[in-house]
Curated annotation (Swiss-Prot):
It comes from the Bacteria. Residues 1-22 are annotated as: Disordered. GO terms for cellular component: cytosolic large ribosomal subunit. HAMAP family: Ribosomal_bL27. This is Large ribosomal subunit protein bL27. The gene is rpmA. One of its GO terms (molecular function) is structural constituent of ribosome. The lineage of its organism: Bacteria, Pseudomonadati, Pseudomonadota, Gammaproteobacteria, Vibrionales. It holds the Pfam family Ribosomal_L27.
C-alpha cells in the first residue's frame, strides 16, 4: 500500500515563448542594407533616414553605414537612422 496521499492538480505551469524583441544593432555599429536594427511591438523607435519599417514595426537598414539613435521633435520620439561611413 502506498504511504503517500495523491498530489493535487495545478492550473499553473505554462508560459508563452519569448519573442526576442529589442535592439539588435546599437549606436555606432556598422550595418549592411537589410540588417535588422530593432525588433519591437509598436513604434517605440521610429524610422529615420535610410531606415525602413516592416509590417511588424521591425526597423531595418536600407543602406550600409553606421547606426545612430536620436531623440527629436516636440514629443521626444526616439529615431533610428543610418549615417554613411
Amino acid at each position: 500500500m502506498a504511504h503517500k496521499k495523491a498530489g493535487g492538480s495545478t492550473n499553473n505551469g505554462r508560459d508563452s515563448e519569448s519573442k526576442r524583441l529589442g535592439v539588435k544593432r546599437f549606436g555606432g555599429e556598422s550595418v549592411l542594407a537589410g540588417n535588422i536594427i530593432v525588433r519591437q511591438r509598436g513604434t517605440k523607435f521610429h524610422a529615420g533616414t535610410n531606415v525602413g519599417i516592416g509590417k511588424d514595426h521591425t526597423l531595418f537598414a536600407l543602406t550600409e553605414g553606421k547606426v545612430k539613435f536620436a531623440v527629436k521633435g516636440p514629443k521626444n520620439r526616439k529615431f533610428v537612422s543610418i549615417e554613411a561611413e
